[in-house]
Each structure stands twice: as C-alpha cells, then as structure tokens.
C-alpha cells in the first residue's frame, strides 16, 4: 500500500464487513469507503475525524436492522454520507433525520414486533439490485 502512488484506494463491505471497511479506510490515507447495511462504527470523535479526512458512502435499505445497532445510547455513530433506500427502491441522499426518526417511531408504535421485519431488508442481493438500478438511472 505504501507504493500505491497516485492510485485511489477503495474499501467496501456489507454488514460487519462494512464496519471493517470503515475501520480499514480510517487507517489508509484518502481511502474512500462504500458500505451497505453497516452497523454504527465509532464514537462521535471517531466520526468527526473520519469525515474530516475520508469519504464514506453509506447505503441503508429501508428497515434494515443492522444500521440501528449498537443502539444510540451506547454513543456509537455513523460516519459518512447516508444514501437511504426507501421501500420502493428509491435512493435519497442524506434524508431529513427527523423524518427518519418519525418513520421509525411510527412503525414501532404500530407494531413492536415490526423490528423483525428489518431482517429481510438486510439482504445483500437487495442492496445490489437497488444500487445497480440507481446507477443505471444516472
């Protein structure tokens, strides 16, 4: 890696692999990270340091449960730029966080067991299909 010259380094991963790609990118000068369904990786200070030096494109599919762990009360944060995939497969860059919170709370109040419905949204095949469709539209 020291001899990479002017070549750009990219890291990517899904789920825990996404967390590992973020940690790897944080240790590589100028690395760009793409992750899909990634859990929260670090503290607020880690996130700020990462965002200052690196780029991360974080994709979250609708109700995917993994990006919601560890819980916020444990003070873990997401780094990078959120690309949210809604239930219709549309991708929105950095959607309004209050709206996202409202949707989540509303879903939990309607059906507390609905959190289990986030498990199928973690499927990497869905991420691949939605992101590929989005790229083909551009």
For each of these PLM feature ranges, what is it?
Residues 1-12, 16-138:
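Non-catalytic, mobile gating and regulatory segments of ester bond hydrolases
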């Amino acid at each position: 890696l020291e001899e990479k010259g002017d070549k750009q380094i990219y890291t990517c991963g899904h789920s825990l692999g996404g967390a590992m790609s973020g940690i790897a990118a944080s240790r590589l000068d100028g690395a760009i990270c793409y992750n899909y369904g990634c859990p929260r990786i670090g503290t607020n200070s880690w996130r700020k340091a990462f965002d200052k030096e690196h780029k991360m494109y974080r994709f979250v599919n609708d109700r995917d449960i993994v990006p919601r762990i560890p819980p916020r009360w444990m003070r873990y944060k997401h780094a990078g730029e959120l690309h949210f995939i809604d239930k219709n497969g549309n991708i929105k860059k950095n959607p309004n966080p209050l709206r996202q919170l409202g949707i989540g709370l509303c879903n939990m109040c309607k059906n507390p067991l609905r959190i289990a419905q986030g498990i199928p949204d973690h499927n990497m095949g869905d991420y691949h299909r939605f992101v590929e469709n989005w790229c083909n539209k551009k």
